[in-house]
Amino acid sequence: MLMPEATRLQEELARSIEARTGRRVRELEIEILPEVVVLRGRTTSWYVKQLAQHCVSIRLPRFGVRNGIVVVAS
């Protein structure tokens, strides 16, 4: 994937995740690798972690998702 495309896609995914989760993922980082998207960040709910992953899966169904979002106590 070309760099400008990856950057644009990262921004689109970030906006989608923020909208779907109500901005409940802190320090969100998205890394796009060949055939896999890596998510990193922090949230207080397993549900929010899964919502973030679902956003990526819907947008990029052929990509795997490595969900490194950490669930922490609030």
Briefly describe each language-model feature range:
Residues M1-S74:
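N-terminal targeting leaders
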